[in-house]
Amino acid sequence: MAALLSPSAMVLTYNERMKKIAIVIVVLLAFTMNAKAQIAEPKDIPQLEFAFQLKVTLGETYSCGETQHGQRIVIPITGGTFEGPNIKGTIVNGGADYQLANKAQNRTELEAIYSIKTDDGVYIHVRNRGIIYDGKDVNGNPSFYFKAAPQFEAPADSQYAWLNNALFLCTPDFSQQFKGIVLNIWKVK
């Protein structure tokens, strides 16, 4: 059928097609802009509630050397105390923070595994994973980031079972004079 059309008719057909394509693009852009404009601020914004503070005593740090994943650093956890509105006790000797340091990226992955014992004798297992980043932000300014997300395993039939059923965040508290590290634990509500 194209052979029957004159060259000027084919140009018109091409121009008409281009107009239709342009209209489709404009309509799609309008829908996209409208969809972005309709995105509302989420109503369920998580809140943080202070759960307790840990004062952790530490042993002598040692390195396992450079591994296939980075430099493995071990920091023994030798004890300490913790206290909050609904919980209080001691940190059991024998845990450790198994850090994986990547010096080229100024990044360290944390994985602390230890137990705590409440004042009424209940043992709770803790696994705290996090990140320390001591580099630069997107603008090239110095940036320090240290956050972790502890998970707790408390006896299901204890008054501490609430630790099993929530997410928690952990932040360091460098404002206190303490030989070791002070960590604040926050429950995500």
Q: What do these predicted regions represent?
A:
Residues Q38-K189:
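Beta-strand-enriched cores of mature, soluble protein domains
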Residues M1-A40:
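Bacterial Sec-dependent N-terminal signal peptides
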